[in-house]
Structure formats: structure tokens, C-alpha cells
From Swiss-Prot:
The modification N5-methylglutamine is found at Q150. This is Large ribosomal subunit protein uL3. Gene3D superfamilies: 3.30.160.810, Translation factors. One of the primary rRNA binding proteins, it binds directly near the 3'-end of the 23S rRNA, where it nucleates assembly of the 50S subunit. Methylated by PrmB. One of its GO terms (molecular function) is structural constituent of ribosome.
Amino acid sequence: MTIGVVGRKCGMTRIFTEEGVSIPVTVIEIEPNRVTQFKTEETDGYRAVQVTVGERRASRVTAAQAGHFAKANVAAGRTVMEFRLEEGDYQAGDQINAEIFAAGQLVDVTGQSKGKGFQGTIKRWNFRGQDNTHGNSVSHRVPGSIGQCQTPGRVFKGKKMSGHMGAERVTVQSLELVRVDAERNLLLVKGAVPGATGGNLVVRPAAKARG
């Protein structure tokens, strides 16, 4: 099974095992994932299911989006995601919930990392600082040399320098699913996941566990 679900990060807490061991967990609320389209090899060239979650005001929905949602007979959502399918069939209007997962399963969680703005090389790339004394002036946090001389006469692409940090799509792999609360549609994942509280998360079965 490769299909995943879209959820919302609720925050972190901890639970205790019967032996009294504390386990840090992230709580992910899996809102009903409403199927907006089922793609097949005959019509689209591949098998996939498209879902939407949450709500969006009608004034924020374009005419094309409104027509797409109306065709599927589902309410407009705040985001649309697509998952490839190896097996199984879905109909527009179906709902996918937390029940597709089981406790003890390994999952990959994808989200947008917290934006940190413009940062220097020490915070962004873990560079070490230069000497605080011994003749060093106004160069305590500078990166140092960024290249050569007349040859090649340029800075190579990919050079680690200051710049915008965070606000990127990040995936944390092979996290243990400690508990599944199907009644409240909650997933408790061991450890931390990307993004701020309230952000969208995509939870999939772990790719490495599938082999």
C-alpha cells in the first residue's frame, strides 16, 4: 500500500509504556481526506487518487477549482494532494481516514519546515566561527574564502553561503507509528516532524520499509 493521507500537525506530547518508559510523540490530526478524482491508466496513463482536506471559502476558490470539486460532489478544501496507487479502487466522494494505518507501522512524514529568514553560514550550514581575539577584527562570523583567484574566476554553484533558511519541503523517513486513534482520527508518531503547529503534513507508509 503506497497511498497516504493529508493531516494537520497538532503539536507534541509524550506517552508512557507499561514499563514506564517515556516516548515523545507528535500528534497528527487526520481530517477526512475526500477523494476528488480517481486516475486510471486508461484515462491518465497512471493510477492515482486525488484528495482534498479541510475547508476553503467560496470567494477563495477559482472557477476551475469550483468546477473540479463540483464534478466530484465534494466541498472545496484548503489543499489538493495526489497519491500513486498500486492496487485498490476509489470513487469520487469517498473518504480516507486514519484507519488505513496500524500501530507499529513505519511511516514517512512530509511537511514544510519552519522558515528562519535570512541566516548566516554558522546557523544555516553549521560553520565554525573564527577566532574571537588574536588579531581578528570584525570577522568573527564570516565564512572565509568562497573560491579561488583568476582561475576559475567565479564562485562554484552550490557553494554554502548565507541565504534564506527553512520554508522547504522536508521528509522525515521511517518514523514509528506508536498509536492510531481511529475514533478521533489521530496518529501518534514517535519523534519530531517538520513544520509548525497547524501545518499540513503528508503521512505515507515508509518507502524503505516497502523495500
